[in-house]
UniProtKB/Swiss-Prot annotation:
GO biological process: mismatch repair
Primary role: This protein is involved in the repair of mismatches in DNA. It is possible that it carries out the mismatch recognition step. This protein has a weak ATPase activity.
Protein name, per record: DNA mismatch repair protein MutS
GO molecular function, one term: ATP-dependent DNA damage sensor activity
Keyword terms: ATP-binding, DNA damage, DNA repair, DNA-binding, Nucleotide-binding
Residues holding ATP: 627-634
InterPro entries assigned: DNA_mismatch_repair_MutS, DNA_mismatch_repair_MutS-lik_N, DNA_mismatch_repair_MutS/MSH, DNA_mismatch_repair_MutS_C, DNA_mismatch_repair_MutS_clamp, DNA_mismatch_repair_MutS_core, DNA_mismatch_repair_MutS_N, DNA_mismatch_repair_MutS_sf
Gene: mutS
Any one GO cellular component localisation term in the record: cytosol
Gene source species: Acinetobacter baumannii (strain SDF)
Gene3D superfamilies the UniProt entry points to: 1.10.1420.10, 6.10.140.430, DNA repair protein MutS, domain I, MutS, connector domain, P-loop containing nucleotide triphosphate hydrolases
Record Pfam families: MutS_I, MutS_II, MutS_III, MutS_IV, MutS_V
Protein family according to the UniProt entry: Belongs to the DNA mismatch repair MutS family.
Length: 881
C-alpha cells in the first residue's frame, strides 16, 4: 500500500492524514519529513524506506482501506544526523514544517519549507568540512554540450560550452566533482546516464525540458543577476551553457524555497584552461582519495589549511591544475615571499581563528543562518585587521601582486563587527527559537518585554505599594487568577473609596475586584511577553540577516580572499616543512626534474627516500623502465606525475629543481583488476585504458604506462607492449614513462626518441637489496625469484623455480636465435601495425569468438548426454581454430 493508491478518496481519512496526502502528492519523488510536535513522521512507502535506510522502528498509525498505515519517525532535535544519512544515500528529502498556530480547529497549517538533495546542501551538519556540494547540469544539442556548476554552500557559479565528445564527458565531470547531476528528461541519450554512473558515484536527476529552454534561459539569468544583458559575462554565443545554468537556478530556487541573493555572477571556463585528468588517472595518482581504505592521498598529505574554505579550495585546485603560467607564477611569487620572510606562520595563526565564513554567508543569503553563524562571522570580522597586519611586510614589499590584491579584497569590516557585537550575545543558543539571542540594550522594545517577563512579581509589589499610598487603603491587594487575570481587590466596605479610574472586573460575596488602565496594560504585556519577546527577537534577527544580505558581495569577496591566502600559506608551509623547490615553466616541450621525490611515500616512509631525476624532451620522449618488482618503477612514474601536477597547481614541488614545459593531459595505465560489474577481465580493462590513451594523447601529454600486456600470453603481451611504444613515440609523440618486465623492449633503446632506464638492485650473499635508484640503461635481470624470496615464498618452491628458470632461459635463447628477432623486433622504420588497431583487435577478440558464440547458444537444460558430448567436440574445434 502506498500514498498514491489512496489519494483518490481523501474523505475516509482523518483531517491530519488528508493534509499529509495533499502535501505528499506534490513531492512524490521525495521522502516527506512531516512535522508532528517533536517528531518528523513518515508514512506509507516513505516509512518503509526510511526504516530500512535508517534502522528505525516501523510502526502504524490509523488505517487506510482497512489496512494499518505504516509510520516511522525521528526526533526533531536530532533529525540532522538522519537527514545526512539519507542524502548521502542519494535520496531527496522534503521538510514539511508546522507554520500556523494551534487553534484547536482542524490540523495546524503545514508546508514544505525546503528540499534537501545531494547537490543543494548548505548545512554544516549535512556536509563535511572539506566536502563541496556541487550541483552540475548538462545540456546537449547536436554536437555541442553545455556544462554549468553551482555550489550553493559557497556561492560558486560557473559554466562552459564545447564540442560534444562522449569519451570526454567523464573527464570533464570528474574535474567538476558533482554531488548531483541534472539532465533534460526529454533529450538525453540513455547511454549518457549509463556512462555517468559508470565513472561517478552521484545521483542523476531528470528535470523538465522547460527548465533547459534556450529561449527562457537568457531572462532567467538576467533576472538572477539584475542585468539587462549577459554580454559582460561572455555568455552571448553560448546558448547551451546558458540553458544549463538556468536549469540550476530553477532547481536551486525550487529546493531552497527562496531567492538566491548570494549568486551574483557567473564565471566562464574553457576546458583548455586546465590539464585534463580522466577518472582513472585521478584514482591511480590518489589525488583526493587513497586507493585503499587506510592509505593516504595527496590531498590528505598536503592539506594543512587552517580554514575549512581553504581546504575546499585546495581540493578544487588539485583536481583542476591550470595551464596559465602567468597565474601559476603569481601564486609561486606569493609563496616565495611568505617563505623568505617566515611570514606564513603568523598568517596561519590568524587564519586558525577564522570559521567557515563561506558557508555562513550562504546560509545568511538563503535565510537559514543560525545565531552561532553570526557569532562566527563577527569573530572573522574581528580577525581581519590581524590578518592584514600579518601580511603587511609582504604587501609593503610589493613583490607579490597577488597578495597585494588579496589584502585589498579582505576589506574593512570594523563597523559590521561593532554592529554584531551590539546585536548578538556572546554565547547564543544554537536555535533562535530558544530565545536570548539578541543582546541587552540593542532594542528598547525587546528589553521592556524581557523586563516584564523576568520581573513581573516585583512590578506587582511596587504597584500594590503605589496604589495603597494613592488610595489610602492599607488592605488593598493585587492578585491574579487564570479566570479573571490580574486584579485589585477591595473589601465591600472599602469599595466606596475606589478611585474613578478603577473599573469593576468581578464582584464577590465580601469583596470587589477592579482593573486599572495601568494594570490592564501590564496584564497584556506580561501575559504575552514571552511570545512577544521571541517574536521580536525573530524580527530583529531577520533584520540583521537582511542587513548582511545587502553587504553580501563584499563579504563574499572577503571570504574568497581568506581561502586563497590560506591555500598559499599552506603551500608555503609545506614547502618549508618538506624542503620543496620552486618549479620553473618553459614553452619548450619537456620535463626536467632533479632529485624528485614522491611526496606521500617520502612522508610515510621510515627509511630515507631515494630521490631520482626525470628527463624527457623532444629528443627523449620515451623512457622504457625495467627492473625488479618492488624496485620503485611505479613510485618513480607516479612521483613524476605528482610533481608535474603540483607545479601546475601553483605549488612548490618535492624536488631539488624542476623545469616543466606545456602539459595538456596526464594519463596513467597503472595496475588493473577484473571489472566484475561489466564482466571485463583484467586484461580487457588494461586494453580499454590503453586504447583511451592511444586515441586521445597528444604531443603535449604526459603518459605513464606500467606493465602493458601482462594479462595475456607472453608473445601477445610483448607484441602489444612493443606496438604501444612504437605508436606513442612515432605517431603520438607524447612524453612517456613506460615500465615493463619485457626486457626485449630494451632493444628499442637504440631508436630515436627512446631511452632505457632501470631501477637498481644488488645481490649480496644470495639476498636481494633494492636500491630504488633510477639509472640509464636496461636492467640486467628481473630478480623475480629474489623478490619472491623476500615475500616469504618457501625455500623448496624457490629452489624448484630456479630449476625451471634455467630450463626456460635455455629454451628461449635457442628460440630467439631463429626467426623471432627478425620478425618481432623490427625497427621503427619497418611496417608496423598501428597499436590502436592491435588493441582494438584484442578487445574485439575477447568480446567475441567462435567458441564463445557457440557456448552462448547451448541450451544446457535440453541436452541429452550424447548431444552434450558432441557439443564439447564442437567447442574444442572452435577453440583450436
Amino acid at each position: 500500500m502506498n500514498s498514491t493508491e489512496i489519494m483518490a478518496d481523501l474523505s475516509s481519512h482523518t483531517p491530519m492524514m488528508q493534509q499529509y496526502l495533499k502535501v505528499k502528492k506534490d513531492y512524490q519523488h521525495a521522502l516527506l519529513f512531516y512535522r508532528m510536535g517533536d517528531f518528523y513522521e513518515l508514512f506509507f512507502e516513505d516509512a518503509h524506506l526510511a526504516a530500512k535506510l535508517l534502522g528505525i522502528t516501523l510502526t502504524h498509525r490509523g488505517k487506510a482501506n482497512g489496512n494499518p498505515i505504516p509510520m516511522a519517525g525521528v526526533p526533531y532535535h536530532s533529525a540532522e544526523g538522519y537527514l545526512a544519512r539519507l542524502v548521502k544515500a542519494g535520496r531527496t528529502v522534503a521538510i514539511c514544517e508546522q507554520v500556523g498556530e494551534v487553534t484547536g480547529k482542524g490540523p495546524v497549517e503545514r508546508k514544505v519549507v525546503r528540499i534537501l538533495t545531494p547537490g543543494t546542501l548548505t548545512d554544516d551538519a549535512l556536509l563535511t568540512s572539506y566536502q563541496s556540494s556541487n550541483l552540475v547540469a548538462l545540456c546537449i544539442h547536436q554536437n555541442q554540450i553545455g556544462f554549468a556548476l553551482l555550489d550553493l554552500s559557497a556561492g560558486i557559479f560557473k559554466v562552459q560550452q564545447q564540442d560534444y565528445k562522449p569519451e570526454q564527458l567523464p573527464i570533464e565531470l570528474a574535474r567538476l566533482m558533482p554531488s548531483e547531476i541534472l539532465i533534460d528528461e526529454d533529450l538525453v541519450d540513455p547511454n549518457i546516464i549509463e556512462q555517468i554512473k559508470k565513472h561517478l558515484d552521484c545521483p542523476v536527476t531528470k528535470r523538465p525540458n522547460v527548465d533547459f529552454n534556450l529561449n527562457n534561459a537568457q531572462k532567467t539569468l538576467c533576472d538572477q543577476f539584475s542585468v539587462s544583458t549577459l554580454s559582460g559575462f561572455g555568455l552571448d554565443p553560448l546558448p547551451l551553457a546558458k540553458a544549463a545554468a538556468a536549469a540550476l537556478i530553477h532547481y536551486a530556487k525550487e529546493t531552497q524555497k527562496t531567492a538566491l541573493p548570494h549568486i551574483r555572477s557567473i564565471l566562464l571556463e574553457q576546458s583548455t584552461d586546465f590539464i585534463a585528468l580522466d577518472p582513472i588517472t585521478r584514482r591511480n595518482l590518489e589525488i583526493i582519495e587513497p586507493l585503499f581504505e587506510h592509505g593516504t592521498s595527496l590531498f590528505q598529505l598536503v592539506n594543512d589549511c587552517q580554514t575549512a574554505m581553504g581546504g575546499r579550495l585546495l581540493s578544487r585546485t588539485l583536481m583542476q591544475p591550470v595551464r596559465d603560467t602567468a597565474l601559476l607564477d603569481a601564486r609561486l611569487d606569493a609563496i616565495e615571499q611568505l617563505i623568505q620572510g617566515y611570514h606564513e606562520s603568523p598568517v596561519r595563526l590568524v587564519l586558525k581563528e577564522i570559521g567557515d565564513i563561506e558557508r555562513v554567508l550562504s546560509r545568511v543569503a538563503l535565510g537559514s543562518a543560525r545565531p552561532r553563524d553570526l557569532v562566527q562571522l563577527r569573530h572573522a570580522c574581528a580577525q581581519i585587521p590581524f590578518l592584514r597586519n600579518a601580511l603587511a611586510p609582504v604587501v609593503q614589499a610589493k613583490k607579490s601582486k597577488l597578495l597585494g590584491q588579496l589584502d585589498q579584497e579582505l576589506g574593512d569590516f570594523k563597523s559590521l563587527h561593532q554592529h554584531l557585537m551590539a546585536a548578538i550575545v556572546e554565547n547564543p543558543p544554537v536555535l533562535l527559537r530558544d530565545g536570548n539571542v539578541i543582546a541587552e540594550g540593542y532594542d528598547a522594545e525587546l528589553d521592556e518585554l524581557r523586563q516584564i517577563r523576568d520581573h513581573a512579581g516585583q512590578f506587582l509589589i511596587d504597584l500594590e505599594i503605589k496604589e495603597r499610598e494613592r488610595t489610602g487603603i492599607s488592605t488593598l491587594k493585587i492578585g491574579y487568577n487564570r479566570v479573571s487575570g490580574y486584579y485589585i481587590e477591595l473589601t465591600r466596605a472599602q469599595a466606596e473609596q475606589a478611585p474613578a479610574d478603577y473599573i469593576r472586573r468581578q464582584t464577590l460575596k465580601n469583596a470587589e475586584r477592579y482593573i486599572t488602565p495601568e494594570l490592564k496594560s501590564f496584564e497584556d504585556k506580561v501575559l504575552s511577553s514571552e511570545s512577544r519577546a521571541l517574536a521580536r527577537e525573530k524580527a530583529l534577527f531577520e533584520a540583521l540577516l537582511e542587513n548582511l544580505r545587502e553587504n553580501i558581495a563584499h563579504l563574499q569577496m572577503m571570504s574568497s580572499a581568506i581561502a586563497q591566502i590560506d591555500v598559499i600559506a599552506n603551500f608555503a608551509h609545506q614547502a618549508r616543512l618538506n624542503n620543496w623547490a620552486r618549479p620553473e615553466f618553459t614553452p619548450e616541450t619537456g620535463i626536467k626534474i632533479q632529485g624528485g621525490r614522491h611526496p606521500v611515500v617520502e612522508a610515510l616512509s621510515k627509511a630515507p627516500f631515494t630521490p631520482n631525476d626525470t628527463f624527457l624532451d623532444v629528443q627523449h620522449r620515451m623512457a622504457i623502465i625495467t627492473g625488479p618488482n618492488m624496485g620503485g618503477k611505479s613510485t618513480f612514474m607516479r612521483q613524476t606525475a605528482l610533481i608535474s601536477l603540483l607545479a601546475y597547481c601553483g605549488s612548490y614541488v618535492p624536488a631539488r629543481a624542476a623545469k616543466l614545459g606545456p602539459i595538456d593531459r596526464i594519463f596513467t595505465r597503472i595496475g588493473s583488476a577484473d571489472d566484475l560489474s561489466t564482466g571485463k577481465s583484467t586484461f580487457m580493462v588494461e586494453m580499454t585504458e590503453t586504447s583511451q590513451i592511444l586515441h586521445h594523447a597528444t604531443n603535449q601529454s604526459l603518459v605513464l604506462m606500467d606493465e602493458v600486456g601482462r594479462g595475456t600470453s607472453t608473445y601477445d603481451g610483448l607484441s602489444l607492449a612493443w606496438a604501444c611504444v612504437v605508436d606513442l613515440t612515432k605517431r603520438v609523440k607524447c612524453l612517456c614513462l613506460f615500465a615493463t618486465h619485457y626486457f626485449e623492449l630494451t632493444e628499442l633503446g637504440s631508436e630515436p626518441g627512446i631511452d632505457n632506464y632501470h631501477v637498481t638492485a644488488q645481490e649480496l650473499n644470495g639476498n636481494l637489496i633494492l636500491l630504488h635508484k633510477v639509472q640509464q640503461g636496461p636492467a640486467s635481470q628481473s630478480h623475480g625469484l629474489q623478490v619472491a624470496k623476500l615475500a616469504g615464498i618457501p625455500a623448496n618452491v624457490i629452489k624448484e623455480a630456479q630449476k625451471r628458470l634455467r630450463i626456460l632461459e635455455k629454451q628461449q635463447q635457442q628460440h630467439l636465435q631463429t626467426s623471432v628477432q627478425s620478425d618481432l623486433f623490427a625497427t621503427l622504420d619497418s611496417e608496423v601495425t598501428p597499436s590502436i588497431q592491435v588493441i582494438e583487435k584484442v578487445i574485439e577478440v575477447e568480446v567475441s569468438s567462435p567458441a564463445l558464440d557457440l557456448l552462448k547458444q547451448i541450451e544446457v537444460d535440453n541436452l541429452t548426454p550424447r548431444q552434450a558430448l558432441e557439443q564439447l567436440y564442437e567447442l574444442k574445434a572452435a577453440l583450436n581454430s
